[in-house]
Amino acid sequence: EPLSAVEMGNRWRELQLEEEKEIERILGDLAAHVARLADELTWTVEALADLDLAMAKGRYANVLDATEPELIPFRGRPGSVAAGEAGYRLDLRQARHPLLDPARVVPIDVALTGEQYALVITGPNTGGKTVSLKTVGLMAAMAQAGLHLPVAEGSAIPVFEGIYADIGDEQSIEQSLSTFSSHLNNIVAILGRADDRSLVLLDELGAGTDPVEGSALARAILTHLLDRRCTTLVATH
């Protein structure tokens, strides 16, 4: 290798090392500068996230033609000063399922006074009972998230601590679960958690077994939920 080439190679390597050292210096200065502004930058990022969330909620409300509902606060626990009201007031007017085509969806009205805990939805198959349950559940979840609701003005919805639902057929061949047993597993879990600050949605309660036995089971489940003062909506089979 010619001596001139060796000298040029050494010089090229020196320049590489100087470049790497300069990059490290620049990055170090930048990191130190950012560190001095860490609190301000953190606050700015959080503020931008809050603003982005508020803008997204506003745009979504505009798409849904949504309104701001009245939020009903928690009931008082038994024995507390605010424990006089028997139940939550639920008043959804012209409520629309937010995921269905607005041009085709049929609005529903759902109302529970403060003296009621349960509402039974009955009607023919494909009549919209399950969609009604899902609509109420989504309204409750959206209210919890601080979203406006696709409902008419004057609607009111409670603030629930828990929303529990058993909707649809979850039979499992792998776990040897029939339609009835899968529903029963879900309901057992719900009964163990739901309390007077919960919304419980049950679809086709007691279905999948002998009608007489299913009716007795449904009655026992509803009685238990009523005793616990759970706000409950049930669709019949």
What is each of the regions a protein language model found here?
Residues 1, 51, 203, 237:
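Residue-level signal for inorganic ion chemistry
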Residues 1-7, 34, 42, 190, ...:
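Short intrinsically disordered, low-complexity coil segments enriched in acidic
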Residues 2-39, 104-106, 115-117:
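Switch/coupling subdomain of P-loop NTPase systems
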Residues 6, 10-17, 21, 28, ...:
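Solvent-exposed alpha-helical segments within well-ordered globular domains of core cellular machineries
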Residues 6, 59, 98-100:
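Residue-level signal for secondary-structure boundary sites
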Residues 8, 55, 139-142:
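Detector for methionine-enriched segments
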Residues 20-74:
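Charged, surface-exposed helical/loop "interaction arms" that form contiguous linear patches used
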Residues 73-236:
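ATPase nucleotide-binding head domains, primarily ABC-like/P-loop NTPase cores
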